[in-house]
Amino acid sequence: MKVLVTGAGGMVGSHMVELLYDRGDDVIGIWHKNKKNIEQIAKPIKFTQCDLRYGYGIDDIIMENMPEQIYHLAAQSYPTVSWVSPAETIDVNINGQVAVYEAIKKARKYKDSSYDPMVVVACSSAEYGQTLNELDDPYVLETAELKPLHPYGVSKVGQDLLAFQYFMNDHIRCIRARIFNSTGTRKVNDVTSDFTKRAVEAEKTGVYELRCGNLETRRAIMDQRDLVHALMLLADKGKAGDVYNISSEHIYQMEDIVKMIEKAIGHELKRNIDPALIRPTDERIIVGNVEKLKADTGWKQEISMEQTISDMLEYWRNH
């Protein structure tokens, strides 16, 4: 099968192209700004640089390859950046997606009117926003109201609804995947990534201290391999036009993460609480109800947090 992955330079995208290649697919990966993750891939996967906002680039890629599945992962994906650069966030996330869909329409018009790819759009738990603070049950359903609290969340609502309207009006099959917290190798700037990287630095220096924030915070975190597996299952088995949560069902306190790291490295870490790492207010536990995902695809979370941490430690030892 010919498959296109946008955002192939990101954590999820770079792992996805490898897993699709291992499955036997003919994979094309699109990257834009950062090649670091792609340079770590030894497999003979085709990569091309493209800024999706300029439609002629993605037009040519889709017209030439006519992929049967498209995983649209490319995005400005940091909420904090969206506060500083709201216009760019909206531009990249909304207009980039419009360009992908318009390229599909052009391929139908000029090359094959029966062209019928499945488009899996990476949406976000950030779409729920304030609703997460109002619900009694932390396990949020796909039917919950969308009340985003930052420009990034707004842009993801836009992507979500754009996919739906192209499905309804142009009959372009899609899956809208609302993705919750994930981590893994090649991830940067999240708690698990920061802690494992600092632990490896402690191994190298012999100073077993860990700079950290509020260790009582709790998060539902899944391994990026479980996330990629869910996305691949949805492309094959999900109901076209529908929306699905992808979330860990396991909740971890940050102190538990530190203890897992200590066990993995065989050494205790002195906790150095840095006030700069403590948020003035912290969000509630964010967990997605994944019963719909499991019912329609058979997905289940398979990779333990202990395994994720072990793999991340090994990654930082070698990079």
Which role does the model predict for each range below?
Residues 25-35:
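Conserved glycine-rich Rossmann-like NAD(P)H-binding loop of the short-chain dehydrogenase/reductase
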Residues 210-214, 241-244, 253-259, 266-285, ...:
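C-terminal "lid/loop" region of Rossmann-like NAD(P)-dependent oxidoreductases
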Residues 52-92:
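NAD(P)H-binding glycine-rich loop region in Rossmannoid oxidoreductase-like domains
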Residues 42-54:
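Rossmann-fold cofactor-recognition segment
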Residues 131-138, 161-220, 224-233, 251, ...:
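NAD(P)-dependent short-chain dehydrogenase/reductase
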Residues 3-22:
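N-terminal Rossmann NAD(P)H-binding glycine-rich loop of SDR-like oxidoreductase domains
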Residues 84, 91-102, 112-118, 125-176, ...:
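Catalytic helix-loop patch of NAD(P)-dependent Rossmann-fold dehydrogenases
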Residues 305-319:
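Amphipathic terminal alpha-helices
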